[in-house]
């Protein structure tokens, strides 16, 4: 009988096992607020918002979780997002007492509802979401400590992982590949790979570069601009990422997918045109 390939999927519990509470949800969220109050994120926002203001946004928005669960904003949720709303309510069927009880990706849904309720500032949605993403990535990165967890994993863990022909991970860190010295499949992106929006060798990055939208990445915060997939609507982010990998065929399918236009990095026709002109870009 031929040897069957064995695969493994690694999640955040793997990091918690070796890094402890520092990588649990509540500690990550607490770290964002601590870092904000220490003015760590001034460079991310070009000094347009203070650390105390960022901290207050988190504590105020957390109260929206209870209101969303209570049905206060049901009327403004689009029909296409009803399943997301019901899933949120099912998971938060109790009253939150602290801001750090809100799950990482659930912050994006709360923020989304906030902008639905305040439609007059809807143009700020993308930049606000991007700011949240980058702060969360920084808090997970934990001054780079997360990238050193492999040093504490030891030979038994290395031998165990080498017993799998393919290793998949939901985590952004690069500990497993540093430990086993083999490629690892990052399903949600990783800290060492630049985001498509910032990489001029990708379709999205090329279009931004052509428009002069390139962003200067602050020194020491490079990890905040990686290709991590971070969103409350998981189905959307995977469909969009997959479509980019499939080129024009994928982009055309994306146009008929029913995904709200706000999730696209640019109008579909612009993406298709850029791909035709530069088929080497993905």
Stretches with model-predicted labels:
Residues 2-282:
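SIR2/sirtuin NAD+-dependent deacylase catalytic core
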